[in-house]
Amino acid sequence: MSLRFVIGRAGSGKSTLCLHEVQEELKQRPRGETILYLVPEQMTFQTQQALIGSEDVRGSIRAQVFSFSRLAWKVLQEVGGASRLHIDEAGVHMLLRKIVESRKDGLSVFQKAAEQNGFFEHLGSMIAEFKRYNVTPSNVYEMWQQLDAHSSSAEQKLLANKVYDLQLLYDDFERALIGKYLDSEDYLQLLVEKLPQSEYVKGAEIYIDGFHSFSPQELEIVRQLMICGARVTITLTIDEKTLAQPVNELDLFYETTLTYEKIKQVAREEKIEIEKTIPLMEQPRFHSPALAHLEAHYEARPNEKFNGEASVTIHTAANLRAEVEGVAREIRRLVAEENYRYRDVAVLLRNGESYYDVMRTLFTDYNIPHFIDEKRPMSHHPLVECIRSALEIISGNWRYDAVFRCVKTELLYPLDVRKETMREEMDEFENYCLAYGVQGKRWTSEDPWMYRRYRSLDDTNGMITDSEREMEEKINRLRDVVRTPVIRMQKRLKRAGTVMQMCEAVYLFLEELDVPKKLEALRIRAEESGDFLFATDHEQVWEEVMNLLDTFVEMLGEEKMSLSMFTDVMSTGLEALQFANIPPSLDQVLIANIDRSRLSNVKATFVIGVNEGVIPAAPMDEGMLSDEERDVLSAAGIELAPTTRQTLLEEQFVMYQMVTRATEKLYISCPLADEEGKTLLASSFIKKIKRMFPDVKDTFITNDVNDLSRSEQISFVATPEVTLSYVMQQLQTWKRYGFEGNLDFWWDVYNFYVTSDEWKQKSSRVLSSLFYRNRAQKLSTAVSRDLYGDKIKGSVSRMELFNRCAYAHFAQHGLSLRERDIFKLDAPDIGELFHAALKRIADRLLRENRTWADLSIKECEHLSTVVIEEIAPLLQRQILLSSNRHFYLKQKLQQIIFRTSIILREHAKSSGFVPVDLEVPFGMGGTGSLPPMEFSLPNGVKMEVVGRIDRVDKAEDENGTFLRIIDYKSSSKALDLTEVYYGLALQMLTYLDVVTSNAHTWMKKGHAASPAGVLYFHIHNPIVEVKGDASEAEIEKEILKKFKMKGLVLGDADVVRLMDNKLSTGSSDIISAGLKKDGSFSARSSIASEQEFNVLQKYVHHTFENIGKDITEGVIDIAPYKKGNKAACTFCNFKSVCQFDESLEDNQFRTLKDMKDSEAMEKIREEVGGE
């Protein structure tokens, strides 16, 4: 029994020496004593290849490469102890979830924390750490007793409570495993116990290579290996000079030196012979003087400079994508020009979550075979999502999001249906569920679902149309597709008495859905498209889910469990599932994490993402215990994993390992922005490399080829898939700025695409975008007639929409596009309710021959309650009755109508104007409807402007009859004459024109009427600020001011006083007008003369005629207006249709100039030739 160390700096040949010794031994004695070669898990594959990679050694039974866990399997198979079932990470998380749920009421700290994402991953890691560091539940309990006895501060009490929770959960976990199961850490403890019984290990020659440190548990394994084996050889990355000095935590080799001392101490304790250490002083790895210099002087202070041409390259990239593309181009160049194999190249990085998806996509585009040494979670696979969402449907009372997450896995679809058709039908079905707010018992009820198009509150027609009947049948058919398998599982789960029966319900759910056949179809499709990685995913996921169910049954099969706990435990297990890495092929680029990789002897290494806070890593407190808490435990004798501070000290060694992997070339790069455009800073580590290699230039990587030289641009000619976008970029530049003669090779590339049989069709579609203009072609007369007919009937809102954006009008009224209806209360619904409520109150007053002024406060409250109760069942499929939240909202809306009724009562008391009618239709046909506003357009098309007027008021005096329009709004609004001029605010003036033009036939007395004005009434329940001692009357007066109506009124003092009979001088509290002492109007009054009202009405007619002419002539320009901070696109539903983009030459806003009312009025006069 002896111990031998082989030490040396990185690249000194430690592993090579050991491998050569093993190979020589195998050549000389192929059947001798066992040779064990122990390496970290991630090194096993490459070490196995290296061991049998020589011509003399093509295979071996005598020598085997193991990791600690694989050696445990081997030994336990030999001597026994492996009869207990293995529990993987998913099983551990499930068991912990069950333990936490059962212990929840007794936990001090983790009761709420258990609901946070990642909690069980952290808890599992903490327990694994306890085991690796030989900390038992009793050790943790003793620690809690010490802490609890001496806790005085809040921090100390928190730690004591945390340790208490940990010991409870750890103890329960260990008790659950005893005699039944083994987790990954248990295998190592069993290995320690069983090694003395192993004949396989006894007398073996043992090599331990690639480790820098050992946990206490691993150190015990090393102890037993030294006792059982003939000789143990351990390699450590240490400079021999370090061993001659006192150990300093700032030393580059501090961690490995500590490991060296710990192992020697174990050898002394076991009286193991310690052979003379073999120090390796040369640098055989490095074929590059620059890389040899980097390794030899890495830790030197100040930095030793290397002058001359270096094989070290530094890149700064515009963004993360440009960085990865730069790496891909250089890898292809190395393979094409320097005879590299892909296996000669490695990419090292730390923040893989930011890079892996981009690298998979781009390396595939560049045809670079690659292997990412990182396990991927299964959580996004359709099968895992189907199980998780189906269980959430049942436990969460059929919520919309869970139902349609399950639907979109497409595993609920019948096996024999055409997926494309089913997807379209399910999209329609989802729209129905959103529009009708379907959830809860409606899914499980046997009552058929009804389908009716929601039209308005006034639509009381109960007849169902044929199209509605067809849609109803389709919806009920699709409902059964979705609910039948889930309800079947729901019933089985409710009947289940044990966990085994619950797992059986899940299994039957999957079998009845024909999931194995569906996954097989997905696998075949992936293989046919050449995506072999995803093909194997579909195989793996079924196997892993079945293993998970088996583990669940094995662990908890006979226990009883609530449905909610079962769902939580199952979801926890599903979250932990991971795809196994397929071993890399013989010729692939290896992409690996800096912290976990154990590469050796690759020719070129690319270290990417070298940004501040990433390399070196910023300190982060993660897991169950903070650094301070770990220090407290350490001081009390419980050794755990290194703290953040210790990890940061080790960062220098990690970075040293990172830059000493390559034999010929080292590339270091960082992006200046991430995928979202957020700024990133270069790491200080790059500055260090620049100081060591002052002649190395930091080159900038960009994907804009126009900024690069000819030779640099040529490197962008890679695969046809990738190069096509750069050809487009060049052609776009030449089109805009002209051709540069020295870049003619791009024409050769272009000619390849247009002449290649394979690429001609694909490239033509892309290249055609070069001449793309986002313009909507004018419709032909025939198409326009087909869309709009020979007679156009439209509302004022439709005409205003055309002036806001002609294309939006075309999308809504030509193509009849609509946003999907969602079961929610929007502003239009609230506005409709307000209108209907006030009309019902007004109609009741008219029937009773009363006015608003006759109402008492109590009657206002009563009537507002009555009408809201009448309307609520009719609004938006009874949305106000659908939930407690909406019921509360109904009460708030009733309060607003109550407040509005009070204000209308006050207005009526102060006004000579009385309502003539509400919701007055024009051009709608039927009794009581006024005629439409009619136009005969130059092209022969007839156009009618129709609508419904909120309220018409009338007043009479010796000068005649006056009419005014009141429009109810749920938000504050005023009449802007600039918007009238641009055709954006035509509604009120149109209404006024309709009622005054038809007064002689409409009014009962049959005589003409003059315009008195147009006013907006803001329906709301305002909050006012008053002094603390303000009386109720003062408060009511302030509230009344908040309801001042804005608009435009006739500039006649008598008419204004009819609107507010309390007004003598000053500003009115009711309308936006005021009088001076001399009887003239104040400057802030919104007034117009009768002649100006006539001009405005003429202008409205003129504008409508122009709009009608443009509509019928096929104008659909993508030309939205912009006026100040208002723009047509702000609330437009059709932005995704028109693709308006200001960066395109053709897409610019129609900027409308803001004007004073007087200036706008003058322009309006000019347009119609008014005086």
UniProtKB/Swiss-Prot annotation:
Where along this sequence does the record place binding of ATP? 8-15
What cofactor does this protein call for? Answer: Mg(2+); [4Fe-4S] cluster
What molecular functions are annotated in GO for this chain? 4 iron, 4 sulfur cluster binding; 5'-3' exonuclease activity; ATP binding; double-stranded DNA binding; helicase activity; metal ion binding
Give the GO biological process terms. double-strand break repair via homologous recombination
List positions binding [4Fe-4S] cluster: 805, 1129, 1132, 1138
Q: How is the cofactor bound?
A: Binds 1 [4Fe-4S] cluster.
Q: Does the keyword Kinase apply?
A: no
> Which EC numbers characterise this protein's activity in its record?
3.1.-.-
Swiss-Prot/TrEMBL keywords: 4Fe-4S, ATP-binding, DNA damage, DNA repair, DNA-binding, Exonuclease, Helicase, Hydrolase, Iron, Iron-sulfur, Metal-binding, Nuclease, Nucleotide-binding
Give the InterPro entries listed for this entry.
Answer: ADDB_N, DNA_helicase_suAddB, DNA_helicase_UvrD-like_C, P-loop_NTPase, PDDEXK-like_dom_sf, PDDEXK_AddAB-type
Q: Where is the UvrD-like helicase ATP-binding domain?
A: 1-343
Domain UvrD-like helicase C-terminal: residue ranges: 281-587
The protein's superkingdom reads Bacteria
List the HAMAP family hit by this protein, alphabetically. AddB_type1 (MF_01452)
**Family according to the record:** Belongs to the helicase family. AddB/RexB type 1 subfamily.
Please give the subunit comment from the record. Heterodimer of AddA and AddB.
> Other notes on this protein?
Despite having conserved helicase domains, this subunit does not have helicase activity.
Function, in words: The heterodimer acts as both an ATP-dependent DNA helicase and an ATP-dependent, dual-direction single-stranded exonuclease. Recognizes the chi site generating a DNA molecule suitable for the initiation of homologous recombination. The AddB subunit has 5' -> 3' nuclease activity but not helicase activity.
* Protein name, UniProt field: ATP-dependent helicase/deoxyribonuclease subunit B
